């Protein structure tokens, strides 16, 4: 598809490109809608409850749709003491990078928007921009809880971005490329979760922290910060922050599938099943584990969060790079 889009420019290509972008947005919005429902159902099951069961039948299939409609009808309030331009701009800054990173993710061997030579670097660089929107929203709200939540988000991103990147370096060393398609191709014989188990563990933990998910949801800690950086937001502006969070859940689950679970490569002897199905199954498994974390683990303290990143994950990621370099030089 990307070869066709890169051919001679024309209005047809432009229209198709934006049409495919709109289609991807609809797919992601559908994922967000039912990821929220799945999260509520799974947590309800783990807590001995039924979960949503009224709107849209006994399974509550339209509960999230009803919640979104209710959210959009809420009053859009702006605090009197807020910095209005930045307050309005912050949700857009937070959401836009979350959708931009999807362009670099190959979902199958044939379906990808851009075959970027440094796709992994692109993802890491662009995803970090969301923190600017979070900090801006916290500061512009002129609220001490919002500001503290924004500063926590910045500190957490800086701390966990380093081990996340360094753990991904082991994958880059084995694949010999930062192109995500090449990384999937390099896992034709063995998935990198088996060749790089330590890197997978570090990357997964750092990814949970990057997503601000339990047990690392310090920027939004309800019991400490009254919802954190978006405490002063309501209506559709608050929805932008929530949407960014779940779009990143979509993107990070896809990235973990690409880097460590072989992407669309099948399990041995089951090659007759399409690659897109395998990608979806691995993707759903990662999303389920992230939901399971929320229903299982308590929130860690802020000091424990920082110490774990700098004193545990960072040294382990350095050890993994050295071991990978030695193994690469001796056996490959």
UniProtKB/Swiss-Prot annotation:
Pfam families (UniProt xref): NADHdh (PF00146)
Coiled-coil stretches noted in the UniProt entry, renumbered to this chain: none
Swiss-Prot/TrEMBL keywords: Cell membrane, Membrane, NAD, Quinone, Translocase, Transmembrane, Transmembrane helix, Ubiquinone
Localisation per UniProt entry: Cell membrane
Keyword Lipid biosynthesis: no
InterPro entries noted in UniProt: NADH_UbQ_OxRdtase_su1/FPO, NADH_UbQ_OxRdtase_su1_CS
Membrane disposition: Multi-pass membrane protein
Entry keyword annotation includes Transmembrane helix: yes
Transmembrane segment boundaries: 16-36, 87-107, 116-136, 164-184, 190-210, 231-251, 253-273, 277-297, 312-332
Range of residues in the leader sequence: none
Catalytic activity reported: a quinone + NADH + 5 H(+)(in) = a quinol + NAD(+) + 4 H(+)(out)
Protein name listed in UniProt: NADH-quinone oxidoreductase subunit H
Organism listed in the record: Geobacillus thermodenitrificans (strain NG80-2)
Gene responsible for this protein: nuoH
């Amino acid at each position: 598809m990307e070869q066709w889009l890169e051919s001679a420019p024309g209005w047809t290509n432009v229209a198709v490109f934006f049409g495919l972008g709109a289609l991807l947005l609809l797919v992601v919005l559908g994922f967000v809608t039912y990821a929220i429902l799945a999260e509520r159902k799974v947590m309800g099951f783990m807590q001995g409850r039924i979960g949503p069961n009224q709107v849209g039948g006994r399974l509550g299939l339209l509960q999230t749709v009803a919640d979104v409609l209710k959210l959009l009808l809420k009053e859009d309030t702006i605090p009197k003491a807020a910095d209005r331009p930045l307050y309005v701009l912050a949700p857009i800054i937070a959401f836009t990078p979350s959708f931009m990173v999807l362009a670099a993710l190959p979902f199958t061997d044939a379906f990808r928007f851009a075959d970027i030579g440094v796709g992994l670097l692109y993802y890491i660089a662009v995803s970090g921009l969301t923190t600017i929107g979070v900090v801006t929203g916290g500061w512009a709200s002129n609220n001490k809880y919002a500001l503290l939540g924004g500063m926590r988000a910045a500190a957490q991103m800086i701390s966990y971005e380093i081990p996340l990147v360094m753990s991904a370096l082991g994958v880059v060393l084995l694949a010999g490329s930062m192109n995500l398609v090449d990384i999937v191709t390099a896992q034709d014989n063995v998935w990198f979760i088996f060749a790089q188990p330590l890197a997978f563990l570090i990357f997964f933990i750092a990814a949970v922290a990057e997503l601000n998910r339990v047990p690392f949801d310090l920027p939004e800690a309800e019991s400490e910060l009254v919802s954190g950086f978006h405490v002063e937001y309501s209506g559709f502006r608050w929805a932008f922050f929530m949407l960014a969070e779940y779009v990143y859940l979509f993107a990070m689950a896809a990235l973990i599938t690409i880097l460590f679970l072989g992407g669309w490569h099948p399990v041995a002897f089951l090659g007759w099943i399409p690659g897109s199905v395998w990608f979806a199954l691995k993707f759903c498994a990662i999303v389920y584990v992230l939901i399971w974390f929320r229903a299982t683990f308590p929130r860690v303290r802020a000091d424990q969060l920082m110490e774990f990143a700098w004193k545990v994950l960072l040294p382990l990621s350095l050890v993994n790079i050295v071991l990978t370099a030695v193994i690469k030089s001796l056996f490959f």
